[in-house]
A protein has these predicted regions:
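S-adenosyl-L-methionine
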Residues: 1-18, 57-86
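Conserved beta-strand signature within the Rossmann-like core of class I S-adenosyl-L-methionine
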Residues: 117-127
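A short SAM/SAH-binding and catalytic strip from SAM-dependent methyltransferases
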Residues: 89-104
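Conserved SAM/SAH-binding beta-strand->alpha-helix loop
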Residues: 53
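Conserved SAM-binding loop of SAM-dependent methyltransferases across substrates and taxa
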Residues: 30-42
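A short glycine-rich, Lys/Arg-flanked "PGG" loop and its adjoining helix->strand segment in the class I
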Residues: 107-119
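Conserved class I S-adenosyl-L-methionine
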Residues: 20-29
Length: 127
């Protein structure tokens, strides 16, 4: 489900700009939230975009050539981030429709996201 600009900007407000730590985005799709993160001042080089759809991955690589685009499954986040994340993330931002998944799958994704995060860093989710 595509994100509106206002929602994307609201989500981006929770991400710290003055950091060098990576920002992980789950399910970026066509980049609505990604754009909001960049407009907020997040350097593309900090972005780790985890996208399942190969077509969206190609689009994201074209639109954000300095971001790290990972074709992977956010619901298998540890595997998807294994080689992509070189430091604890300053934020995980998710546009995934979590409520459509069974509770155990949702909880696993959230646990894995917190493992990837630096202490005190936000997990930002809308559903």
């Amino acid at each position: 489900m595509p994100s509106g600009r206002l929602l994307a900007r609201t989500m981006a407000q929770y991400v710290v700009v003055d950091s060098n730590a990576p920002v992980v985005e789950l399910g970026p799709g066509t980049g609505a939230i990604t754009n909001a993160l960049i407009e907020r001042g997040i350097d593309q080089k900090r972005l780790v975009l985890v996208e399942y759809n190969p077509g969206f991955c190609a689009l994201l690589r074209d639109r954000y050539p300095h971001a790290k685009v990972v074709q992977g499954d956010a619901y298998r986040l540890r595997d998807s981030l294994r080689e992509a994340l070189d430091a604890p993330a300053s934020a995980v931002v998710s546009g995934l429709p979590l409520v459509t998944k069974p509770m155990q799958i949702r909880l696993k994704l959230i646990r894995d996201a917190f493992v990837a995060l630096a202490p005190g860093a936000p997990f930002v989710q809308f559903t």
